[in-house]
Structures are given as C-alpha cells and as structure tokens.
C-alpha cells in the first residue's frame, strides 16, 4: 500500500511542509510563534469574513452597523471581540517572533527575513486600515493624522494625500476604499506567508545554538505538532480571557463615540501595537523627519543581516550582546509607554532619548559589541 500522503501531488507538499519536515531536535518554545501566527491569521480571516457580512462601509451607517453586529447578530459580540483582540494577539506573537529572529540570528536566512519584514509592514497596514472601519472618533482622527503624514513628501505630498482620501478630507470614499483594502490584504498576507515558508524550507530552521543542525534532525510530526499545540492552548486561553472578560481593555474609549470631524479628541493615539513607532514619529519636531524616522524604525530590520559582525550566529554565548538586546527590549517598552502619553515634558525628552537609543543600539552598539566579543574570544 503506497502512502497517499507521500504520493498525492497536493498531499506531498503538505507532507513535506508540516509532517515529514526534518526539524532541528533542540528548537525551543520560541519557535512556536510561526505556527501561532498562522493560527492568528486564520482566526482573523474567519472572524473578519463574518463581520464583513454584516458591516456597511458607509460613513452614515458604519458605526451603527458595528453596534448592530454586537447587539443583534447571533454571537456578533463574540466575533467582534475575537477579531479586535485577535489583532492584539497577532502583534504580540509578531513582536516575539521578530525578537526571536534577532536573538538567535535567524535573520541570516536573508530571503526569509526580508519577506518577513515585508509581511510585518503589510500586517501593520492591514491593522491601520481596519482600525478606521468602526468610524469612531479615534478611527476618524487616526486616519486623518496618519494619512496626512504623506503630505510631508516634497512636491507630490498634498496631491498624494487627496488621492488616498478620494476627496479633500477623510470621508465616505476613504472609508469605502479602506474597507476594500482591509478585505484584500489578509489574502495577500496569506500568499506572502506561503512564500515565507517556501524560503524557510529551502534552508531549514535555525536553532538556539546557531550551529548547523543537519547532523541531528527529527520529523516535525509528532514532536513539534504536539509542542505547537501546547503554545496554541496558551494563546487561545489568553485570547479568550481577553475577549470574554475585558474585551475593551486594549481599545480606546474615544472610539465608542461616533466620528465627528468638528471635534478633535484630546489625545490622538493609535492601538498599543503602533505606539513604539508613534513615539519615534513624535520625537522629531520636523514633519518630514518624523515620517522618515517612523519608516526607518521598521525598515531598519532590513539592514540587520548586514550589521551582523559576530563570528557566532546566536546570542546564546554572547553576554555583552545579550545585555544590549535586553536593553533594546526595555527601550521598546519605554517607547510604547511614551507613545500613549500626551506631548509634554518630561515625556518629550524621554521619547527623544528612547528613540536615539533605539537606533543607536541596533546600528552601532550591538555590531560594536559583537566585534569586541570576537576579540575577547580570540585575542590574536
């Protein structure tokens, strides 16, 4: 009896990707986040699909259609809460996944890393346009402020902003096109995830030691399928606790007020997962400079493989670089906190110092520490 799993054209691909895939024998729970992100994406697409069945992308009815979903649709409140908090779980997993990649030197698989960074940007774009859809105060003003940043581009800025708006302000045309983008982007993300996996399976997974793992591989199933299910249980528990007990904890109270172009909220701020980048944007008093810093805060990930100066791949045996890595992590927490604070002292100066430290650590300090560690290990 020939095993259909190994012969059928479609099954064969799934088999080589998730069942008989040779995986390093020592990968830790930090390697769970890839599969968790896959689950997050699936949850978001499914809940989003059901929300889209009842949502109307019109400025007059968008806000009330979301209220209608929560009040009148069977389990609409649950679908909406899962979708809103699912986004938070998605970003938590994303940040941990990227952090794992930096810590263990996974960025040396350049193709996988680069498409991963593009994926991160695409997910951020999707979350941004999605946040506009409920048409609350923060939706409207967030859309106005962030799209307006493009007007900092010389010559074409203003024209570009009005082209994106579909008029002279954020209005019906903007909401309709943002809904269209929010619907299509997750499917584009899905295709990119497949490419991400394709590149990863060209090289095989990295492992905590950073040493070539080819001498000791085990099949993905049952070992890592079971291990991933454990991580999945933890994530689903967290998501359900959030969605069922405090669904609005991570949201903004201003978004429960329908959008009003005549009334600006006292503090315009994005969702928590954008606050670090928002803090970097606000820390520069010049509009164009702020926009460039905002872009650089994410795009700097693309040059990390070029900044790898160590003779070792992973940080596991490099205490100086480890300390700087955790400083970078703490710095991102500080930036996240600052992004949610009003623009006044001492928050302004803290934000500026944290922004400088962010780029300094990635571009100069960690590569310099790696060179020092090379010398300390081999002083010849």
Swiss-Prot record:
Binds 2 heme b groups non-covalently. Keywords: Electron transport, Heme, Iron, Membrane, Metal-binding, Mitochondrion, Mitochondrion inner membrane, Respiratory chain, Transmembrane, Transmembrane helix, Transport, Ubiquinone. The chain crosses the membrane at residues 33-53, 77-98, 113-133, 178-198, 226-246, 288-308, 320-340, 347-367. It is found in: Mitochondrion inner membrane. InterPro entries: Cyt_b/b6_C, Cyt_b/b6_C_sf, Cyt_b/b6_N, Cytb/b6-like_sf, Cytochrome_b, Cytochrome_b_C_euk/bac, Cytochrome_b_N_euk/bac, Di-haem_cyt_TM. It comes from the Eukaryota. Heme b b566 binds at residues 97, 196. GO terms for biological process: mitochondrial electron transport, ubiquinol to cytochrome c. GO terms for molecular function: metal ion binding; ubiquinol-cytochrome-c reductase activity. Gene3D superfamilies: Cytochrome Bc1 Complex, Chain C. A ubiquinone binds at residue 201. It is a multi-pass membrane protein. Its cofactor is heme b. PROSITE patterns: CYTB_CTER, CYTB_NTER. Heme b b562 binds at residues 83, 182. GO terms for cellular component: mitochondrial inner membrane; respiratory chain complex III. The cytochrome bc1 complex contains 11 subunits: 3 respiratory subunits (MT-CYB, CYC1 and UQCRFS1), 2 core proteins (UQCRC1 and UQCRC2) and 6 low-molecular weight proteins (UQCRH/QCR6, UQCRB/QCR7, UQCRQ/QCR8, UQCR10/QCR9, UQCR11/QCR10 and a cleavage product of UQCRFS1). This cytochrome bc1 complex then forms a dimer. Belongs to the cytochrome b family. Component of the ubiquinol-cytochrome c reductase complex (complex III or cytochrome b-c1 complex) that is part of the mitochondrial respiratory chain. The b-c1 complex mediates electron transfer from ubiquinol to cytochrome c. Contributes to the generation of a proton gradient across the mitochondrial membrane that is then used for ATP synthesis. Heme 1 (or BL or b562) is low-potential and absorbs at about 562 nm, and heme 2 (or BH or b566) is high-potential and absorbs at about 566 nm. This is Cytochrome b. It comes from Tarsipes rostratus. The gene is MT-CYB.
